[in-house]
Each structure stands twice: as C-alpha cells, then as structure tokens.
Regions:
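Conserved acidic donor-binding segment of nucleotide-sugar-dependent glycosyltransferases
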Residues: 110-112, 116-123, 132-137
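A short alpha->beta transition loop at the rim of the catalytic pocket in nucleotide-sugar-dependent
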Residues: 64, 71, 93
Length: 191
C-alpha cells in the first residue's frame, strides 16, 4: 500500500514473494496504490511468473476494507518519513512486517512485540519473515493483538498531547492546547 515509486521498494517485495511463492501456492500478494513504477512492477511480476498471484489494485477508496481481508501487511520501503500506511495496517489489527529503513518503522514497530523488522533492501530476510509469520498462527494473532494498540500510541489525542508538550518545552508557554475544540488558537494569535 503506497505510491508505486522506487522509494517504497515494491521490487524488493516482489522478489521476496517470489522466493517463498513456490512453497506456498495458496498465497496471493495485493499491492495498493499508483505511481511511476506500476508498469515496471507489473512487468517484473510477469517476468517472475507471478502475474496470476500478484494483484495491482490501484488506488482504493477505503484501504481498510482490503486490509481487513488479508493475513498480514508487509512494508518494503528503502526509506521513509513517518509511514501512515504502517499505522493504518496496525490499527486494522494486522500483523506487520517492515524493513528497518532509515527513520519511521523502528519508531512505530516494537520488534517482536507488535510487528517484525527486517534489514532494508534484503528480499531474503523479508521472505523469511513472511514465511515465519504465515507458518505461525499464534504469533500472527499475538502481533495483531498488540498492533491495534498503535492507536493508543499514535492516535490524534496522543499526538496532540505530545505536540503540546513539545511546544511548552520549546516556547515555554504554560497554557495547554484545547484539543476538544474545532480549532486551535495559540496564545497571542486570534482567529
């Protein structure tokens, strides 16, 4: 799920899927999103003889409907900022696997607790993690149960509280922001 661009590493995901696909013919891979790499990725899936098992769904109005019908979420990015797709998947109660790329995933996933981190750009490690997770229903259930707690850690109310704490530390303004109002007014600024 994401923009189909080099940064997101969908080529790595396709290679990882190829590595384990022969042993698991019942598996399918769904890729959501659009981007400059779509044709290249579709050609790669065909070259890898995966075109029947890899589905490019394009932009999906409500990705949670697709996510709820899957067994896991895999993020194969080369680099990230703060990957909302990962948080969305966890909030849907999916066990997640992600590359431990610079910034992002390791700030979100507690490795082995609510998700699995593997080295970035390592299709073999990604494939092994996928096989491990699908072979162990209890581990999938445990990770999924913990994953939904992401809302407690990164929900809007929690994030606003953290921003408020940061603002107080940096600016030294003692008043708290009122997150229950429709708009936020900072002291000294009137709307």
């Amino acid at each position: 799920m994401g923009r189909l661009v080099k940064q997101k590493g969908f080529d790595i995901l396709l290679e990882a899927f190829r590595l384990c696909s022969d042993r698991h013919p019942q598996w399918s891979l769904y890729i959501l999103g659009e981007g400059d790499e779509r044709e290249t990725l579709e050609a790669m899936a065909e070259t890898l003889k995966l075109q029947e098992r890899v589905k490019f769904l394009g932009l999906v109005k409500d990705p949670s409907l697709v996510l709820r019908d899957t067994d896991m979420f895999v993020m194969s990015s080369r680099f990230e900022g703060f990957p909302l797709a990962l948080i969305e998947a966890m909030a849907c109660g999916l066990p997640v696997i992600s590359t431990d790329c610079p910034t992002g995933p390791s700030e979100i996933i507690r490795n082995g607790v609510d998700g699995i981190l593997v080295p970035a750009e390592d299709a073999h490690a990604l494939s092994a993690a996928m096989e491990c997770l699908l072979a162990d229903p209890e581990k999938r259930r445990r990770l999924a149960t913990e994953a939904v707690n992401i809302v407690d850690r990164f929900g809007a109310e929690k994030v606003m509280m953290l921003w408020d704490q940061l603002r107080m530390q940096v600016v030294g303004i003692p008043q708290r922001l009122d997150v229950d109002k429709e708009s936020i007014v900072l002291p000294g600024h009137r709307s």
